Swiss-Prot record:
Stored NCBIfam families: aroD
UniProt-recorded name of the protein: 3-dehydroquinate dehydratase
Family: Belongs to the type-I 3-dehydroquinase family.
Organism, as annotated: Thermodesulfovibrio yellowstonii (strain ATCC 51303 / DSM 11347 / YP87)
Name of the gene: aroD
Active site residues according to the UniProt entry: H120 (proton donor/acceptor), K147 (schiff-base intermediate with substrate)
CDD domains: DHQase_I (cd00502)
Catalyses which reaction(s): 3-dehydroquinate = 3-dehydroshikimate + H2O
Length: 226
């Protein structure tokens, strides 16, 4: 894994962002998540990844989110796209409960790519027992990092996610709450073991996402950056 800082800040970009946003605007980012389901086009997709790699000189995470877990549109040839961008990627993200997850696990091992097994719940934050079941499934599948993102509707949801983070602080996890009420978790959880927090530049990819400049400033104030 090629992250210089942990916790790391991942900035989320689309294809048009790669073509238009200068390197200077990504100052403070440790990782770029390219959200293919948010791309305007998926033809010649490897060109976008190659450009991002050369232009920004940061590790790349390829994510092609399913609509049922927050994807903006359905991408039917997900496996083919993952295979096409292997030369440029350091990380893949795949839903733990997706049909392609076992194949992506083997593909990642073969190509020395860190695989993030993710779970997104846009309705609520499940119980601790249910979160543990998701975590156990991810571990059983051999995911390198397990990401859990849930909708925060009340204060106790923040507490549940923080407790889960503390419980697994020695594991490789990403834990965050979505929605306006989930914003504190994007700031607090990285202090206690969540490896990556996600930030936006223009369009947010999940409710409650914080702008990159604000997240970098927050990390500096909290002593997570020099």
């Amino acid at each position: 894994m090629l992250l210089q800082n942990i916790p790391a800040i991942a900035v989320v970009l689309k294809d048009k962002d790669v073509l238009s946003i200068p390197k200077e605007e990504l100052k403070g980012a440790d990782l770029i998540e390219l959200r293919v389901d948010m791309f305007e086009k998926t033809e010649n997709i490897s060109d976008i990844f190659e450009t991002a790699k050369r232009k920004y000189n940061l590790p790349l995470l390829c994510t092609i989110r399913l609509p049922e877990e927050g994807g903006k549109r359905e991408i039917k040839n997900r496996v083919e796209i993952y295979q096409a961008v292997i030369p440029f990627c350091n990380f893949f993200d795949i839903e733990i409960f997706s049909n392609e997850a076992p194949f992506l696990r083997q593909l990642s091992i073969k190509n020395n790519i860190t695989l993030i097994g993710s779970y997104h719940n846009f309705i609520n934050t499940p119980s601790m027992e249910q979160l543990e079941e998701v975590f156990d499934r991810g571990k059983t599948m051999g995911m390198d990092i397990i990401k859990i993102a849930t909708m925060v509707n009340e204060k106790k949801d923040i507490e549940t996610l923080l407790y889960f983070t503390l419980r697994h602080k020695l594991d490789r996890i990403i834990v965050l709450g979505m929605g306006q009420k989930g914003i504190p978790s994007r700031i607090i959880n990285p202090v206690f073991g969540s490896m990556i927090t996600y930030a936006s530049l223009n369009e947010i990819s999940a409710p409650g996402q914080i702008h990159l400049k604000d997240m970098v400033h927050i990390f500096k104030v909290m002593g997570l950056r020099g």
